[in-house]
């Protein structure tokens, strides 16, 4: 899996980059059909200085996206990964259901 890491409006330290890439590797262990992933961290200058994590995952023609805003980058990354995990579960269930319906239709025709 190819992972692209981008930081906007700030310069990340190496620990943050490694943490984000390690989190993406956990998703890859769950589903090996991930082709590419992009992690974008940004900093919104507001009263509370919001940290935003955007994670895009490409899975065989489908793009999954999760965006989280919290007060820390680690929390934002974790929350976005949890969202993507749920999306991957739904995607895998959808693929599994499609294969079952195809078998059922063939049996009904016979």
Please report, for each region that a protein language model flagged, where it lies by residue.
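N-terminal, polar/charged subdomain of small-to-medium soluble alpha/beta proteins
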Residues: 1-110
